[in-house]
A protein has these predicted regions:
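Short, small-residue-biased leader/transition segments that mark boundaries at the very start
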Residues: 2-5
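Divalent-cation-assisted or electrostatically stabilized phosphate/pyrophosphate-binding catalytic cores
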Residues: 16, 69-86, 113-115, 137-157
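Alpha-helical phosphate/pyrophosphate-handling elements in metalloenzyme active cores
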Residues: 16-47
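Histidine- and acidic-residue-rich, metal-dependent catalytic cores
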Residues: 30-33, 81-110, 152-155, 159, ...
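Alpha-helical scaffolds flanking conserved acidic
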Residues: 41-54, 113-117
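Helix-adjacent hinge/juxtasegments
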Residues: 44, 50, 57-96
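Histidine/acidic-rich helix-loop-helix segments that form or flank divalent-metal centers
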Residues: 93-134, 145-150
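Charged phosphate-binding loop/patch that engages nucleotide di/tri-phosphates or the phosphate backbone
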Residues: 157-179
């Protein structure tokens, strides 16, 4: 329930409010399931979906760090590691071990599953930004270079989805939503 109180910087399409972490995680998980055929490699979709659902759970304690916040990114790892230890310690040992391992796998971004989960983490807010006319990028002064730096990592999980992302970004550059 606490995840519903943590607001991301991205606005929900047609709702005039920011998305919360629970919505972000759910959107990612359902997108992963629906888009799994576009993963670069065969993936265990259950593992991907669980990664999607838990990847931001540490923000209950650590708070949300905006993807383009250079200062916040400096302390993000330490804050999130402490939060992970506290939150997962509430679980029975077997579940703590399983979810901690999946969380660490997501963070390391070295397996087909974690790379595809990261692709969903990149794609999902981009889709919301696209649906709100690039408003969040304009509001926060985000440049095309910043978005491409983040989105280039999507290629590791899905080259096909990156092609769609590139088309969306080129459209927003033409429209002046990204400089």
């Amino acid at each position: 329930q606490r995840q519903m109180c943590i607001r991301d910087r991205t606005h929900l399409s047609g709702h005039g409010r920011n998305e919360n972490d629970a919505e972000h995680a759910w959107h990612m998980a359902i997108m992963a399931y629906l888009l799994r055929e576009y993963a670069n490699e065969r993936v265990n979709i259950e593992r991907v979906m669980i990664m999607c659902l838990i990847h931001d759970i540490v923000e209950i304690d650590a708070g949300d760090t905006y993807a383009y916040d250079a200062e916040g990114l400096k302390t993000q790892k330490a804050r999130e590691e402490a939060a992970k230890e506290r939150i997962f310690s509430l679980l029975p040992d077997d579940q703590k071990k399983e979810l901690s391992a999946l969380f660490d796998e997501f963070e390391a971004n070295e397996t087909p599953e974690s790379r595809f989960a990261h692709a969903m983490d990149n794609l999902q807010p981009l889709m919301l930004n696209n649906s709100n006319g690039g408003g969040d990028w304009r509001e926060h002064g985000v440049s095309a270079k910043q978005v491409y730096a983040r989105q280039n990592k999507t290629k590791d999980g899905s080259l096909k989805l990156f092609e769609v992302i590139d088309e969306i970004l080129q459209k927003h550059i033409r429209l002046g939503n990204l400089k």
